[in-house]
């Protein structure tokens, strides 16, 4: 789906950048991050969201026998995402720890130097990783951004590749993808000249 972070306010970008990590730490639907692996035990299926500069997507994969589980997970990403405050707090703590470690990492220093050279020290779309960036990450903003970017499936294209038979796949698509709520609004990305 077109749009991505190009449609967000600058103040929302830090929250958008780490939103997918929080979702992965939160679980899905009614299942916490500790319950979900138990529910999926013995199955090979996953689905995850991504928000890029110009697009947002939900990708999934599975073995053939677990296609329905993967489609259920895609469906839940649209209609019942899970944002868990504990998952958010874990990510913030990881970022705080990373901030300490990266001070001694020559690769990170080089990356910061390149960012400053290309965009300046205070570019709102290409911020340096520091205390200010971490402070601007908001749990509530993440939920709002997610609803904005994934609240309408009308402009998503679904591509399915694999060895599943069409006769088996069609009723699953009708059950899980065709039932995702949409409104007729289609978006496009915005050129923010970064």
Task: State where each predicted segment sits.
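M16 family metallopeptidases and their MPP-like homologs
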Residues: 1-24, 28-80, 92-100, 106-136, ...
């Amino acid at each position: 789906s077109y749009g991505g972070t190009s449609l967000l306010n600058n103040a929302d970008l830090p929250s958008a950048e780490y939103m997918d990590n929080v979702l992965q730490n939160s679980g899905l639907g009614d299942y916490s991050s500790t319950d979900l692996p138990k529910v999926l035990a013995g199955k090979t299926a996953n689905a995850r969201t991504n928000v890029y500069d110009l697009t947002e997507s939900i990708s999934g994969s599975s073995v053939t026998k677990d296609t329905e589980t993967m489609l259920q997970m895609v469906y839940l990403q649209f209609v019942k995402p899970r944002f868990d405050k504990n998952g958010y707090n874990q990510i913030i703590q990881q970022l705080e720890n990373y901030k300490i470690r990266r001070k001694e990492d020559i690769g990170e220093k080089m990356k910061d130097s390149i960012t400053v050279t290309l965009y300046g020290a205070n570019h709102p779309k290409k911020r340096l990783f520091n205390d200010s960036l971490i402070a601007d990450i908001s749990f509530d903003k993440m939920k709002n951004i997610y609803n904005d970017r994934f609240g309408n499936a009308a402009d998503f294209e679904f591509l399915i590749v694999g060895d599943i038979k069409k006769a088996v796949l069609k009723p699953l698509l009708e059950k899980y993808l065709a039932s995702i709520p949409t409104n007729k609004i289609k978006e496009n990305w915005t050129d923010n000249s970064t």
